[in-house]
């Protein structure tokens, strides 16, 4: 029920297709934002999510699903989105993410998702969704990943869905201070 409440069709309906950049709201002067990314190239998807954080509930204002492209292109997508909205940012620095960390131009926090850090990343994000603290337009790809994720995907041996990782990274970034500078 919380996932269904999070995705509001009145905010827009989008597929979330490959390389479909979705901008629900352009940057607003004085607003605050947080961006998160999950990296993938060959098998899964690189997802970049930006939250507007000076409103309640926080609102997904930009979404990109990409992949099967060279790393420099996807890193540039992330840097461009962070540059456009400003604010704080986090990305998955697990595995190849540590290499990517060396190429990101923005001041993003690289988060290694292991052990207690991984658990708290997902727990905090899930609690925010359950408390109605995050809303998003109905993005079919993102909604499906959120709706069908299992406990094993997040806390066990399964694979955490890409849009959940990106959303959790954006939510984590929202807990850091950051005001857009014009």
State the predicted function of each range.
Residues 44, 97, 121, 162-166:
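Catalytic-loop motifs flanking and including active-site residues across diverse enzymes
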Residues 1-37:
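ATPase catalytic-site recognition across NTP-hydrolyzing enzymes
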Residues 38, 92, 162-165:
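Acidic active-site catalytic centers that drive phospho-/nucleotidyl reactions
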Residues 27-53:
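Gly/Thr-rich phosphate-binding beta-strand-loop-beta motif of the actin/hexokinase/Hsp70
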Residues 2-3, 45, 133-138:
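Proline-centered turn/helix-capping motifs that create local helix->coil transitions or kinks
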Residues 47, 73-77, 165:
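Well-ordered alpha-helical segments embedded in enzymatic catalytic cores
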